[in-house]
């Protein structure tokens, strides 16, 4: 009787309204999470739970059991999604959720549909000899980065909860196990389309495309060519998203086609990192040995991934193969222009320009070249430039960003000359710049310090402090000024790891 009551209470916490589970059986494998020994709730994202219309009181009480997979709420239809993918350029026809289980979907108070997924919830038919589990480090990393991206205003999956399992996981060393609860607009990837296309399953591609249009792009239902319009819309969202990554120095680290969503959200934060000193060739991921997914390569990789999506949609775009290729190629060519427009618009904002002039690109590129040559910190340089825009006395602090402070003089002269023709007042400009140039990002060394304290000592104090700081990245927080600072040489993170 007790377990039934608990299940009923848990069910009330999630007003599930599942749709993906209604797709044909070949789209997924039904899979119940595997129970764990002693779950403990590390963190519940209560504001997000409220936004999703969840019962926070129930989640506080039963969250450890629910978010570990020990207690499956009523209305859930747990499943592992099928997908394929190009990983570092090589195609794998079957990947799928090897350690993630989709519990179901909820519709928030604004009518938006979201997936609720457990990562590290045990093996699935797609586990490929893996244990289906996650270690606490990658779980905390994803929690931190997800919420930081949200606060920065960058479309990304969200963190609803993190729990420890009371069980070890075995990687290069024995680590505490954990489960992460992810919220996403959906978990449909470029690789999901590839899964069906690789099998010659055009009906599957069509069913998936129809589902994506209905869920993410309903305004395309009545388009003359809805599948071509879908391809164009996904391309537009990815161009805008990747431009936003570059604006904050974000390096995803593993831009495989199975890690690119069709919703336009950033997903899968395993080896991701934020750049310290500006260098377009920056790579952190330990598995990216040739720099395929380096900072500056991300726009081109986005285009490459979208070309793979286009290949899957060709039979739907036009029955005549040559016509389909021509139409898809036009979308791919347009991606480059779209990305450049989004990137330049954002960079204009970062240096305080409200209007547009032909020389703006050269002015931006000159600053970036100077930053690279002078070893300037990406985030701090732009934040100090924001201060300088409103207070000429801040020039000393800005110049200190460069190895040779006097080196910034010629660029500052060009910048000020350009500002003289811009319509904003100094105060307006400084305010606008502070809204796009964060003071706080998830500094890699700070993330690692928080993870290390949790793994080695079970201490989540640094984790909580980091979440507090990163919730307001564009605000001055005098009590946390140290979190703005770049790492000391001894603190630098040189490589990040996927964690799987």
UniProtKB/Swiss-Prot annotation:
ATP binds at residues 96, 98-99, 119, 131-132, 182, 189, 268. Its EC number is 2.7.7.-, 2.7.7.108. It is an enzyme of class 2 (transferase). Pfam families: SelO. Mg(2+) binds at residues 259, 268. One of its GO terms (molecular function) is ATP binding. It catalyses: L-seryl-[protein] + ATP = 3-O-(5'-adenylyl)-L-seryl-[protein] + diphosphate; L-threonyl-[protein] + ATP = 3-O-(5'-adenylyl)-L-threonyl-[protein] + diphosphate; L-tyrosyl-[protein] + ATP = O-(5'-adenylyl)-L-tyrosyl-[protein] + diphosphate; L-histidyl-[protein] + UTP = N(tele)-(5'-uridylyl)-L-histidyl-[protein] + diphosphate. HAMAP family: YdiU_SelO. This is Protein nucleotidyltransferase YdiU. It comes from Rhizobium leguminosarum bv. trifolii (strain WSM2304).
